[in-house]
C-alpha cells in the first residue's frame, strides 16, 4: 500500500502532524511485535525458491521501511530467494514507483531484462506504481488486501488467486 502517513491522512482525516504521530504509535508496536504477526501466502516462498533456482531474478519493492522488509523476508523464508530487498527510506517520502525504481536500479537491469520484468502486487498502488515505471503488474488476491475488483480497475495485466495460479500465469 501507500506510505502510512498518506493512509492516515486520507483514511482518517489526520493532519500531517497527526499522521506522523499515528505512524510513530503504530511502529511502536509493529516494529517489535507486529512485524512477526504477518503470514506468508501459502506456497509462495517455495515458488520463489523454485523461480530463483530456474534463473529468475527476484526483488521485493515495498513501501514498508527497508529494515522491516528484511526482517519479514528472513522470518518467512523469502530472503534467500531475493537478489534485492528494497523498502522505503527514512524521511525520503518515497512513492511506490520510487521504491520499484530503487529495486530495479539495485538489480542493475539491462534494457532487455526490463522488457521481461513484471511487478507482482496486492493493491492498486502496486499496479499504479508499476505502470509509472513502465512495467506490467500481475495482481494477487491471495493476500486479501485488495477490495473486490480493485486490481482489475487499476489496470492489472492479470489477477490470480493462488501462488500456483501465479506460477502458471508467469509460465504462460
Can you say where each PLM-predicted feature lies in the sequence?
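A short, structured active-site edge motif that brings together acidic residues
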Residues: 79-94, 116
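Conserved H-loop
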Residues: 36, 79-83, 110, 157
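Conserved Lys-Pro-Asp/Glu-containing loop-to-beta segment of HAD-superfamily phosphomonoesterases
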Residues: 96-127
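Substrate-recognition element of Asp-dependent hydrolases with the DxDx(T/V) motif
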Residues: 44-73, 86-88
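N-terminal helical cap/lid subdomain that shapes the substrate entry/recognition surface
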Residues: 1-45, 52-54, 67
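Acidic, Mg2+-coordinating phosphoryl-transfer loop and its flanking beta/alpha structural elements
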Residues: 119-160
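Surface-exposed amphipathic alpha-helices with a cationic face
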Residues: 45-52, 104, 127-132
Amino acid at each position: 500500500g501507500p506510505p502510512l502517513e498518506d493512509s492516515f491522512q486520507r483514511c482518517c482525516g489526520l493532519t500531517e502532524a497527526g499522521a506522523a504521530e499515528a505512524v510513530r504509535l503504530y511502529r511502536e508496536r509493529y516494529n517489535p511485535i507486529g512485524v512477526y504477526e504477518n503470514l506468508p501466502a501459502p506456497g509462495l516462498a517455495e515458488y520463489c525458491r523454485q523461480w530463483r533456482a530456474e534463473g529468475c531474478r527476484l526483488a521485493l519493492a515495498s513501501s514498508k521501511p527497508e529494515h522491516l522488509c528484511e526482517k519479514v523476508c528472513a522470518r518467512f523464508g523469502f530472503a534467500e530467494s531475493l537478489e534485492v530487498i528494497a523498502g522505503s527510506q527514512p524521511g525520503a517520502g518515497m512513492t511506490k514507483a520510487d521504491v520499484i525504481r530503487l529495486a530495479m536500479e539495485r538489480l542493475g537491469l539491462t534494457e532487455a531484462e526490463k522488457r521481461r520484468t513484471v511487478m507482482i502486487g496486492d493493491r492498486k498502488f502496486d499496479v499504479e506504481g508499476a505502470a509509472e515505471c513502465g512495467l506490467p503488474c500481475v495482481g494477487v488476491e491471495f493476500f486479501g488486501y485488495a477490495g473486490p475488483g480493485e486490481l482489475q480497475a487499476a489496470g492489472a495485466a492479470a489477477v490470480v488467486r493462488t501462488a500456483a495460479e501465479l506460477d502458471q500465469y508467469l509460465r504462460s
